């Protein structure tokens, strides 16, 4: 069986689609094939066909913390945003990989469950958030994840415990082994619904005030080096507001790179490399990217 056979069976598969339509940066080249599975069964079929036909496979969630190079991606790209069910039982919330982190956090809040307030403004998907152990305002996914259901590249379903996920700062096991996150279950604490929602609305207001939400952006680009803060280093190095092509280090929040109009992925990457070079020269600190960079050069 081949990919186009699955298309005939009703799986949503497109060809030669610009990924800039889906990324938060509004940049990125074309996907050779692009699929939007609507069920775990469809994901399993797609993975099996790519394995049997030796087709390269790339998994994407909400594409919020992602830069796709201008040459695009060969093989099949699966976007999981149509897998978005969120279920609540007792003190646990289970969300599909494509469910938005924000929607999951607010669903928990409306059920009077506390623990995901930190995630109220994180724009990514559950799969991506678990993949990178996303965090904000002092909280991280690893603090609330109870278990993660995955599909291995070999086609096996597994469930990992929190410990087995090997979470660390902006890292998890699935970054290393290539397993595909299908859903995650969060263990939360009963609380006062109105107080939880008030705190989430406060954090969202703070985010809008501090972050350049008015421009396309992939969020915070760099991991925080131990003992240092990226934003102040960029400001002191005279790099805030620096622009390469259409990509600019935000004048509102140093360390966020925004698309001021017409930016390419190459603009983003050239600006990232410039910032890394200058920070290394001035502070002898290596800045590592938090944002995921994939695809091929044009």
Swiss-Prot record:
Belongs to the MurB family. GO terms for cellular component: cytosol. This is UDP-N-acetylenolpyruvoylglucosamine reductase. It is found in: Cytoplasm. The gene is murB. Pfam families: FAD_binding_4 (PF01565), MurB_C (PF02873). The keyword RNA-binding does not apply. Cell wall formation. The active site is at 170, 220 (proton donor), 290. SUPFAM superfamilies: FAD-binding/transporter-associated domain-like (SSF56176), Uridine diphospho-N-Acetylenolpyruvylglucosamine reductase, MurB, C-terminal domain (SSF56194). Keywords: Cell cycle, Cell division, Cell shape, Cell wall biogenesis/degradation, Cytoplasm, FAD, Flavoprotein, NADP, Oxidoreductase, Peptidoglycan synthesis.
